[in-house]
């Protein structure tokens, strides 16, 4: 309890002397009124002291506004950085696909269809072709939905070994079988003679290094390169074995499904991301392309005995957060030598006594502890910039490349439509990352980019290209 100010105590005594004849109820009312006035007086006194100390009441608002401005600057900084860090791999994946489509005729020949698209589009009427493409798209999307739900259920019930086995088998097929087919077709196209032993050694080294980099550990650039390569290989398979109308319809429907799966409260992809966040786990590297390292190596904790030696006879170490790492120098033999003196770093008891006599005893306060914790957290945040990564699903890479590859393979063979689709996808990706910086939650990456890509494709192929052909035919220059 704090003492009452002089005017208030005087008022209290006078009031009590005048009202001795009143009942206890009146006294209780006076007491409540006095407590109310006491609270008002304390608030007025607090405001007076804050103003006298030169601190305006709106200082806290200014601090909040300053923190918000710093957060916005940080968002813009990392947003622009990671936009470029995602533009490069997406561009590389699409360039690999387009270059393969333009040079290797194997991926433009219609040799068959996927088992998930059983209906052919070689029909007599447009209505039958449209119906078959719709049925193919429904079957394909159903398979994708079932596989996604199965993955979420396995992850929900911690069936990590099953998921790892599933992803490893998929990676093995892509890195060995599809890579062998791709390499063989490239050698045939450029008439490169190669024996089977050399091809086997090449594919073996390529596949084994890829499996290690993706599913275990490896340099970040190597992991990213393999993820881009397997995305391009999968996109080439879809481009070759998906009929034309079915491919466009699948791209349109998959963007809508991606929107529902990520944003709906019970969407499978949203449940997957939320479950990973609740468990504080990173998603599997074989599913996600990250602009930073996917696998994290935790720092080893310091030796408890060494920490006790370092923290002995030191009041400053009491202010250090318990989770901050302790860094010691010296060889192992020096730390184990029993003859050496205590490792006080020159800050002996005499030095501390002399310091206390000059400056007074050094005690930690709540403010100093909070300041040290904020400083240590800022240092740790600055030391781990790799965790500030933007992650993009490999499915997004695949369908971006399918759109550009189909445009390159089916659109009159001109570069205008291909480049238009390429620019549209990058614009959509930029807008998606902008929305990600604004809403700060997981967002679908397909809807905006695929919508722009489809609009640019059909507008360029059916409007811009005929217009340019007519201008060239009549020799008009704009």
UniProtKB/Swiss-Prot annotation:
Keywords assigned by UniProt, alphabetized: Apoptosis, Cell adhesion, Cell membrane, Cell projection, Endoplasmic reticulum, Endosome, Golgi apparatus, Hydrolase, Membrane, Notch signaling pathway, Phosphoprotein, Protease, Synapse, Transmembrane, Transmembrane helix
Membrane topology per record: Multi-pass membrane protein
Record region (Required for interaction with CTNND2): 383-410
Keyword check for Magnesium: no
Active site, renumbered: 258, 396
Topological domain ranges for the Cytoplasmic compartment: 1-83, 155-167, 218-221, 274-391, 440-443
Annotated site, Cleavage, chain positions: 292-294, 299-300, 356-357
Stretch list, region Important for cleavage of target proteins: 289-291, 388-392, 443-445
Region (Interaction with MTCH1): 475-478
InterPro entries xref list: Pept_A22A_PS1, Peptidase_A22A, Preselin/SPP, Presenilin_C
Record-listed Phosphothreonine modification sites: 340
PTM description: Heterogeneous proteolytic processing generates N-terminal (NTF) and C-terminal (CTF) fragments of approximately 35 and 20 kDa, respectively. During apoptosis, the C-terminal fragment (CTF) is further cleaved by caspase-3 to produce the fragment, PS1-CTF12. After endoproteolysis, the C-terminal fragment (CTF) is phosphorylated on serine residues by PKA and/or PKC. Phosphorylation on Ser-357 inhibits endoproteolysis.
Annotated motif PAL, positions: 444-446
Membrane topology, Lumenal segments: 105-133, 191-195, 243-249, 413-418, 465-478
Residues covered by region (Required for interaction with CTNNB1): 333-461
Major localization listed first in the record, in broad terms: endoplasmic reticulum
Compositional bias annotation for Basic and acidic residues: 30-40
Known EC number: 3.4.23.-
SMART domains, per the entry: PSN
Positions bearing Phosphoserine: 52, 311, 342, 357, 378, 382
Domain-level remarks: The PAL motif is required for normal active site conformation. Substrates, such as NOTCH1 and APP peptides, are bound between PSEN1 transmembrane domains and via the first lumenal loop and the cytoplasmic loop between the sixth and seventh transmembrane domains. Substrate binding causes a conformation change and formation of an intermolecular antiparallel beta-sheet between PSEN1 and its substrates.
Self-association and partners: Homodimer. The functional gamma-secretase complex is composed of at least four polypeptides: a presenilin homodimer (PSEN1 or PSEN2), nicastrin (NCSTN), APH1 (APH1A or APH1B) and PEN2. Such minimal complex is sufficient for secretase activity. Other components which are associated with the complex include SLC25A64, SLC5A7 and PHB. As part of the gamma-secretase complex, interacts with CRB2 (via transmembrane domain). Predominantly heterodimer of a N-terminal (NTF) and a C-terminal (CTF) endoproteolytical fragment.
UniProt name for this protein: Presenilin-1
Taxonomic lineage: Eukaryota, Metazoa, Chordata, Craniata, Vertebrata
Originating gene: PSEN1
